């Protein structure tokens, strides 16, 4: 919306700054953070009143988690509100990548909201059918992948190679849908401790904001010899809003958390990250930058698969952050150490932009 005012720069030279993606990214970050920070307390109070007992605590979880009983969930509503309002103010609303990313984020958020609603109302840690949830997620992700295919290429880039795409043809749709759904659920599995998921999400969002900006700028893309994707630069503004909203949410989610993100937030943010990775052709780099999410997801896959085969467990508890809690790490130790890992992995992922 604010981009519109840049057309009056002949009369008001100062508004020309709205043309710049870098300025609007910072502005979106500050706007979304302020919205979440200001309206957070009232949203938390409303959710606490409506939810009563709050999010159910896993009976087989660490004993220290039972003191969290009564903490409201669906905190993703705060995050999504900040992102959407800020995005509509600062993003280029004619950009198709913006709308595709918003479609996935809000659709995944709605799926997560319904899952949270069932958990709270039924007071169980099980939401609605996993198959039904995955089916809905794949449906939304496939639509997004189809749209991206229509406006771009069917390829994905390999790290360390100069502007080289592996073209998938129509297989691009199921491949991209898998990336989006897998990322959404990986972030969802990571969201198990106070502040654990939101900081790695912000780290990944900031990293992909840079990637989106570079991929969408012909000069930078040519200099770095990465694939140029016209229009993706605008995703940096949207991801800036994610970072700002995440900072605002962390104020309330820091231990001891006043609110949990819930599936409402984790699915939405993960789905958004996956969509941006697909749009910028950096799906493989997402595995590096979002490596913490990958490890969390694979720990569950390994645990479930091994248990079905042997009736034994590889980890004391999955996802893997609970394993370290069972090993004697405090919650703060797990969270901060996982934050450090996510930052290191992001730096490794970003280094691939230059190492070609």
UniProtKB/Swiss-Prot annotation:
Keyword Amino-acid biosynthesis listed: no
Membrane topology (UniProt): Multi-pass membrane protein
Keyword Transcription regulation appears in the UniProt entry: no
PROSITE patterns: MRAY_1, MRAY_2
Organism the protein comes from: Bartonella tribocorum (strain CIP 105476 / IBS 506)
Protein name: Phospho-N-acetylmuramoyl-pentapeptide-transferase
Cofactor(s) demanded: Mg(2+)
Signal peptide: none
């Amino acid at each position: 919306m604010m981009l519109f005012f840049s057309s009056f720069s002949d009369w008001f030279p100062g508004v020309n700054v709205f043309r710049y993606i870098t300025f609007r990214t910072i502005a979106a970050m500050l706007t979304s953070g302020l919205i979440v920070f200001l309206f957070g307390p009232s949203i938390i109070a409303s959710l606490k009143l409506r939810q009563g007992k709050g999010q159910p605590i896993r009976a087989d979880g660490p004993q220290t988690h039972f003191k969290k009983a009564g903490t409201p969930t669906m905190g993703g509503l705060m995050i999504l509100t900040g992102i959407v309002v800020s995005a509509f103010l600062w993003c280029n609303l004619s950009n198709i990548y913006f709308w595709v990313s918003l479609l996935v984020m809000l659709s995944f958020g709605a799926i997560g909201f319904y899952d949270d609603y069932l958990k709270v109302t039924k007071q169980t840690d099980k939401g609605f059918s996993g198959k039904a949830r995955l089916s809905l997620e794949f449906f939304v992700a496939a639509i997004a992948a189809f749209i991206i295919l229509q406006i771009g290429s069917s390829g994905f880039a390999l790290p360390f190679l100069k502007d080289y795409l592996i073209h998938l043809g129509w297989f691009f749709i199921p491949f991209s849908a898998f990336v989006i759904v897998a990322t959404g659920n990986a972030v969802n599995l990571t969201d198990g401790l106070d502040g654990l998921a939101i900081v790695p999400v912000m780290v990944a969002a900031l990293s992909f904001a840079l990637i989106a900006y570079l991929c969408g700028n012909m000069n930078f893309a040519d200099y770095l010899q990465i694939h140029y994707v016209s229009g993706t630069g605008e995703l940096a503004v949207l991801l800036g809003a994610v970072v700002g909203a995440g900072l605002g949410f962390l104020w309330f989610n820091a231990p001891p958390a006043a609110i949990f993100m819930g599936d409402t937030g984790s699915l939405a943010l993960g789905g958004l990250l996956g969509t941006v990775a697909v749009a910028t052709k950096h799906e493989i780099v997402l595995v590096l930058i979002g490596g913490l999410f990958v490890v969390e997801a694979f720990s569950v896959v390994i645990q479930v698969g091994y248990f079905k085969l042997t009736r034994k467990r590889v980890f004391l508890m999955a996802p893997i952050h609970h394993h370290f809690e069972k090993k004697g790490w405090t919650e703060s130790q797990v969270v901060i150490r996982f934050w450090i890992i996510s930052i290191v992995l992001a730096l490794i992922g970003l280094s691939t932009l230059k190492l070609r």
